[in-house]
Amino acid sequence: MDFPTISRSPSGPPAMDLEGPRDILVPSEDLTPDSQWDPMPGGPGSLSRMELDESSLQELVQQFEALPGDLVGPSPGGAPCPLHIATGHGLASQEIADAHGLLSAEAGRDDLLGLLHCEECPPSQTGPEEPLEPAPRLLQPPEDPDEDSDSPEWVEGASAEQEGSRSSSSSPEPWLETVPLVTPEEPPAGAQSPETLASYPAPQEVPGPCDHEDLLDGVIFGARYLGSTQLVSERNPPTSTRMAQAREAMDRVKAPDGETQPMTEVDLFVSTKRIKVLTADSQEAMMDHALHTISYTADIGCVLVLMARRRLARRPAPQDHGRRLYKMLCHVFYAEDAQLIAQAIGQAFAAAYSQFLRESGIDPSQVGVHPSPGACHLHNGDLDHFSNSDNCREVHLEKRRGEGLGVALVESGWGSLLPTAVIANLLHGGPAERSGALSIGDRLTAINGTSLVGLPLAACQAAVRETKSQTSVTLSIVHCPPVTTAIIHRPHAREQLGFCVEDGIICSLLRGGIAERGGIRVGHRIIEINGQSVVATPHARIIELLTEAYGEVHIKTMPAATYRLLTGQEQPVYL
C-alpha cells in the first residue's frame, strides 16, 4: 500500500532505534507543561517541532481519513512516517498487549483523529510503571428488577465456572462491577482444551422417562391447570420444608373434596432450558420459567406442584441480610401421570447439568470424586439430644411400697448410639406419670446408680421390677422425643442407602453406611419421608419414595414397639 509523502522540516522525524528495548516509551524526566511530545534537551527533534501550519495539518488529517481502517507497516528499508509513529506501526514489533491508549496499536482511528485535532496536550507523568487498575464497567440490569438473575442451580459448587459469571442472588446488585481491561489468556483452573474435550466419552443418557434428544428440543405433557399461589421462603430450605410448602400450595388452590374444581386444559413444555405452560388449544404461553429458576417439584398423588423462585423487590434490613427471602410462585396441576412429569423435570435438570460440565471444560467423570468441605457434615437426631447436657437429668420418684413405677419399656434399636431401654408408655396415675418429669421416648440409662446401658431388654425390665419394694427410686434419663429425625446425605439416586425395609419397618442396616451415620436404626418404623407421611402407605410406595429420594433425605422414625403401643395394636405391660 502506498502512503502519501508528507513534507517535513530539515530536522526530520525523531531518530528511533528500531532494535531498542521493547518496553513502553518512557517520557522525559523533565516535566514541562508545553507538550508530552517534547524531546530531551539537545535531542534531534520531535513531532511537536514539525513546521506544519494549520492548512498543512488539516491536509494531513484529510489524508489520514482517506486511508483504510487497517494500516500496514512500511517497508523495512524506509523510514517511518509520523502516522506510523503515532499509531505504533512504524516501530519494531513490541509487546504492548497490556498497554491501552492512543499510543497502542489497538487505538482506533477516531482516537488518533482526536489527537491530531487537539491543540494542547497535558504533560506526561513520570514514575515507575504500576499495574493497571481495574476499570469500571457498567452492566445492563435485567429488564425485570424483580426477576431472579441467579446463575443456574447446576452451576453452584462446580469446580470450574464460566469466566465472568457471577451469582447476584446472595447480595444486592451493584450493577457497576470492576473488570480488568485485558482479558487473561490463561484458561481457568480445571478448564480443558477442545482437544481434551474431544477425548471425553460421549455424555451418558440421564436416567428418566424421556429421551435425551427429546429433552433438548422439549417434551410436552398434558395436564389440567388448577391455579397458582405465592409463598415466601428462604433460598435453600431443607427438603422437608419444600414438601410442606408444596402441600400448603396444594391446599390453597385445590378445592375441597366434593366441591367443583375450576381447571383449564394445558400442555406442560419441559426442556433443558425452560418450562412453559401452554394453552391446549392455541399453544399460547401462559407461563414461562427458565429451568434454573425452578426450585422444587412435588407430585402428591395426581397433583403436581411446580415451584419457581423470584426475588422480592424490597431490600432486606441489615440484620436480615443473611436471610434473604424469596417469592415462591407455586403452580398447581392435575395430571394422571404427575409422577412421570416430575421425573421428566428432574431428568431435564440432570441433562442440563451434564451439558454445562462439558461446555465448561470439566471432565464429567471427575465430578463428585473430591467431596466438598461440607459433605462430611452429618446430622444425627440422637446425637443432638445426647450431646445436650440439659437433656441429661435425674428423676426422683416417690411411691408406695409394693407399687411399680408404671412404665412400659422397649428396646432402643440395633445400632443406636445409646443402646438402652426406651420408655414407650406411662401408666395413667402411676408414679412415673405423677412425677411429671418423664415422657414417652426418654432413654433410661440407670436406676439408683446402676447403669442399664448395653443390657438386653429383659435385664432392664428385671432391674425395674426390683424397685417395687422401695419407696424412693432415682432414675437417670436422657430426654428424647418419641420420633427421631434421621438426615441422610445421598449425592445421587444411584448410591445405596444401606438399609432394608419390610412393611415400613427397618429390618437390616449396613454397618458404617450413610443410613446408620444419619441415624437410621433397626427395629424402627418409618413415619415420614421428606415431609410425606407413610403411616398408612403401602410397602411398594415406601420403597418407591426411598429409591427416588436423594440429596438431603429426611426420614422420621420411632421404635416399632412404641408405634404399636401408641396405636393400640398391642397392650402395654407396665412395670
Swiss-Prot record:
Per the record, which residues fall in region Required for interaction with NECAB3? Answer: 215-364
- Bias regions of kind Low complexity — which residues? 156-184
The PID domain sits at 217-381
Residues that the record marks as modified (Phosphoserine) are S11, S171, S372
Q: Which keywords does this Swiss-Prot/TrEMBL entry list?
A: Acetylation, Cytoplasm, Phosphoprotein, Protein transport, Repeat, Transport
Q: Which GO terms describe its biological process?
A: chemical synaptic transmission; in utero embryonic development; negative regulation of catalytic activity; protein transport; regulation of gene expression
For region Disordered, the annotated ranges are 1-50, 118-211
One example GO MF annotation: enzyme binding
Q: Name one GO cellular component term.
A: plasma membrane
- Chain positions with N-acetylmethionine modification: M1
Q: Where is the composition biased (Polar residues)?
A: 1-10
> Where in the sequence is the signal peptide annotated?
none
Domain named PDZ is located at 394-480, 485-560
Where in the cell is the protein located? Cytoplasm, Perinuclear region
| Biased composition annotated in UniProt, kind: Acidic residues | 143-153
Which body tissues produce this protein?
Expressed in all tissues examined with lower levels in brain and testis.
Function, as annotated:
May modulate processing of the amyloid-beta precursor protein (APP) and hence formation of APP-beta. May enhance the activity of HIF1A in macrophages by inhibiting the activity of HIF1AN.
Q: Could you give the subunit structure recorded for this chain?
A: Binds to the cytoplasmic domain of amyloid protein (APP) in vivo. Interacts with HIF1AN (via N-terminus). Interacts with NECAB3; seems to mediate the interaction between NECAB3 and HIF1AN.
Q: What is known of its domains?
A: Composed of an N-terminal domain, a middle phosphotyrosine-binding domain (PID/PTB) that mediates binding with the cytoplasmic domain of the amyloid-beta precursor protein, and two C-terminal PDZ domains thought to attach proteins to the plasma membrane.
Q: What is this protein called?
A: Amyloid-beta A4 precursor protein-binding family A member 3
Q: Which gene encodes it?
A: APBA3
